[in-house]
């Protein structure tokens, strides 16, 4: 079965700031919108940012491979070269990383490159990649 796009709606504190981050920094094309929400083409998936005035994110962390991973988080598994290009784009834009781009589970079956950062509203994002994409669900 071909992979189907997912739909995810996340709260943001400011629609203009969300447009600048998702549209400008991440390069996601904008779809439909209204005063209180904006659709983005999030790497082939539908991400909707909904205005929630006064939003205060309260992150939680779980240890994974010696690092504190923010929970909840969302993101996409990219091709190797696209992941590296995105990491450089984020660095150039001055985005601060919660977990710097690097390798997790080195030498293990689940070895992957990953990075974590927050959008301006405190939503945690993770982007990851595998040299061999067939290892995504390998045990």
What is the predicted function of each stretch?
Residues 23, 129-130:
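Short amphipathic alpha-helical segments
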Residues 16-17, 81:
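Short alpha-helical
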Residues 18-23, 90, 122:
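Conserved active-site tyrosine of GNAT-family acetyltransferases
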Residues 1-6, 29-80, 84-118, 130-139:
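Vicinal oxygen chelate
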Residues 124-127:
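Short glycine-/small-residue motifs
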């Amino acid at each position: 079965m071909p992979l189907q796009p997912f739909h995810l709606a996340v709260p943001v504190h400011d629609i203009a700031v969300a447009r600048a981050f998702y549209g400008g920094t991440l390069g996601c094309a904008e779809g439909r919108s209204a005063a209180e929400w904006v659709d983005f083409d999030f790497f082939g998936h539908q991400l909707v940012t909904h205005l929630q005035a006064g939003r205060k994110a309260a992150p939680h962390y779980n240890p994974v491979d010696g690092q504190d991973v923010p929970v909840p988080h969302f993101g996409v598994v990219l091709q190797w070269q696209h992941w590296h290009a995105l990491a450089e784009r984020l660095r150039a834009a001055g985005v601060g990383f919660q977990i710097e781009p690097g390798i997790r589970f080195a030498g293990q079956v689940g070895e992957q490159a990953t990075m974590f950062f927050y959008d301006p509203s405190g939503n945690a994002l993770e982007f990851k990649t595998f040299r061999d994409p067939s290892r995504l669900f390998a045990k």
